[in-house]
C-alpha cells in the first residue's frame, strides 16, 4: 500500500515537471516569435547579391582584371542598392543614400575602393591590406604618408568589402589570398628591382604573413623585403614561448 502510494506521488511529480517544462518552452517560443516578428525587416543592402565580386575561382589573372571587376561590382551596388532604397531610408546618415553625409561616393577618391598612389621614381613598393569587415579607408592616411615619403602605394580592397554586408556571406580566406597575390604581382611589375613591403592590419596582417611564407616556397611569387603587422589577427600558441 505504502509503495503504491509513493509510486503514485512520484508519477504525479514527474508529470508536473514535464508539463511545467513543456509550458515554459511553449511560452518561450511564443515570446521569441513575437519578438522576431516585431523586429524591422531586412533592408535591400542586407539581401542584395553582388555576383560580380572576385573570388579565387574567378578567371582573373591580372590586377587590371581585378580592378575592372571591382568597377563592375560597384556599378551593381549603384543599381541594386543605391537606386532601390525606399524614400524613408533616404536619410543623411544612410551610407546608401546618394549624397548623404556618410555616402563614401561624396569623396574623391572613394576610399572604400582599391587605390594606387604612384611615384615617378619610387624608393619602394608598399601593399596595404585592411582588416575583416573593413575597407582601404582605414589605411588611407598611412598610405598617403608613405607616398609622400617616396613609396609607390597600393591599397587593396579585399573581395566582399566596402560594398554591402552580404558581400561577406560567402567570402573565404582563399579569395582574399588570391587577391593579395594579384596585387603583389602588379606591384612588382610596376617597381622592378625595388624592395616590396606589405603593411597588414588585423586580418590583413594574417594575409601578409601567409603571403610572405608562400613566397618563400613559391619562386613565382614576388618576394617581400619586410612585412609590418598592425594589431595582427594571429593566434600564437603557448609553445612558441619555448
Residue ranges and their predicted role:
Residues 199-204, 208:
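Gly/Ala-rich beta-loop-alpha elbow adjacent to hydrolase catalytic centers
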Residues 105-161:
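Short, surface-exposed "cap/lid" segments of acyl-processing enzymes
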Residues 228-239:
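Active-site nucleophile loop of the alpha/beta-hydrolase fold
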Residues 2-105:
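N-terminal targeting or regulatory segments adjacent to alpha/beta-hydrolase or S9 domains
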Residues 210-214:
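Active-site signature of alpha/beta-hydrolase-fold catalytic machinery across serine-
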Residues 163-197:
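Catalytic nucleophile-loop/oxyanion-hole region of alpha/beta-hydrolase
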Residues 160-163, 234:
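Alpha/beta-hydrolase active-site loop signature
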